[in-house]
Amino acid sequence: MANELQKIEREVHRDVEEIEEKIQTSETFLLSAILALSGGFQDAYTYNVRDNVFSNAQTGNVVLMSQHMMLGEWGKALHYLFPVVAFALGVLVAEQIGHKYKMAKRVHWRQIIVAIEFVILFVVGFIPSGYNMIATMLVSFACSMQVQAFRKMHGYGYASTMCIGNLRSGTESLSVYLRDKKPEALKKVAHYYGIILTFAVGAGIGGVCSIYIGLKAIWGSSALLILACMMMVQEKR
């Protein structure tokens, strides 16, 4: 009986190793970290130089929108509503692209998403401050496409442009590890908190760059997306 259990355990371990080897570049920690850096950069950018509106943290926008609505400040409420709508539209478009090009052989559909996101953010760098609402909507649209396209890291769900879900999942995994001492749970903790850390670093860099460089600072996020796209192109080859 003991020998049979050991045999089953070895087979399961081998299967896990094979699955890890087959993980796509889009689900690796390195690419996820690059996307998180870019996501943090975007949020800091729109908050600092685009009228204190969040491009990624739509919960904050909903809170501020609701507050202004209750105060009868409808113009200010719309200021926060439009990025939320743009975020929803981005998810819709990304889902359609994923469905249409999921089986494409020449290019991975996630590469298409990253390429579109890069173009949008590059254009945003040219939009003057008088059109901040349009700029923020475009960043929110691009961000949500990224959120929709990149939802897994080493097989488990995560978010590259926000922290609350990662914080919950990481802390849950920490609790499991403290109770059961499972190495896989500790690995999840490292991945989730690592993504939170890289998001924070990206936000810090984005904040400093937006303060000193201004509107064109968003090109730093575009550069990170180029790197992400190159990694996926290399895998495709």
Region annotations inferred by a language model:
Residues 2-237:
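Alpha-helical transmembrane segments of multi-pass membrane proteins
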